[in-house]
């Protein structure tokens, strides 16, 4: 879970987009893969993982939540992918992780449409596995953790690995270029316009360039 009001509110965009200090493409590609490696480390670890999700899961924070095995949502939880509104695609292997939970149309609504989905919708869509009052979130997450910790660890690990392999058999083949797509989209005029509009609290005017 996150500290404070939110699970993870995502990147700080007030720096104009950020990026590595070294401008060489080879270093930008290396830097951009850090989040992907963190996502896969969570998704592929042997242990069962449970997100205790309060407040926002935005962008990379939403990717982290979907990388876990289960998500317990507080009644104030919500999800949003703001990447589309800042002129870039979603990376960190986040697209297939969401697709497996919510399905194609809902994934498009969230990622291409930038919609915000709140607790009851997330439960209905299968993104979260349980919905509880905020005050009961951590106790419920601990109950789930205790339940799975009592299971045979070897069998549980093999089941988790097999389910992940079956569900995501095409994920890497399709999404292996999402980092490069993000780097490309970050160089566009539309990306610069999106950041300008975000900082100015104005509506962007995209040109498709």
Regions found by a protein language model. Give the residues of each.
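Terminal low-complexity tails and localization/encapsulation signals of metabolic enzymes
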Residues: 196-209
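Crotonase-fold acyl-CoA enzyme core
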Residues: 40-154, 180, 188, 193
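Amphipathic alpha-helical segments used for helix-helix packing
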Residues: 155-161
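Short beta-strand->loop
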Residues: 169-175
């Amino acid at each position: 879970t996150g500290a404070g009001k939110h699970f993870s509110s995502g990147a700080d965009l007030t720096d104009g987009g950020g990026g590595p200090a070294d401008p060489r493409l080879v270093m930008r590609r290396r830097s951009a893969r850090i989040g992907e490696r963190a996502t896969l480390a969570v998704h592929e670890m042997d242990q069962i993982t449970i997100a205790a999700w309060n407040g926002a899961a935005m962008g990379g924070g939403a990717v982290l939540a979907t990388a876990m095995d289960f998500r317990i949502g507080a009644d104030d939880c919500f999800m949003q992918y703001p990447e589309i509104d800042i002129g870039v695609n979603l990376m960190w292997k986040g697209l297939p992780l969401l697709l497996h939970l919510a399905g194609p149309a809902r994934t498009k609504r969230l990622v291409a449409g930038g919609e915000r989905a709140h607790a009851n919708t997330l439960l209905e869509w299968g993104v979260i596995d349980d919905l509880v009052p905020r005050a009961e979130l951590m106790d419920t997450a601990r109950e789930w953790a205790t339940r799975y910790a009592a299971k045979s660890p070897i069998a549980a690990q093999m089941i988790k690995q097999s389910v992940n392999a079956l569900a995501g058999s095409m994920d890497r083949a399709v999404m292996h270029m999402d980092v490069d797509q993000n780097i490309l989209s970050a160089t566009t005029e539309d990306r610069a316009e999106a950041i300008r509009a975000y900082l100015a609290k104005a509506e962007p005017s995209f040109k498709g360039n």
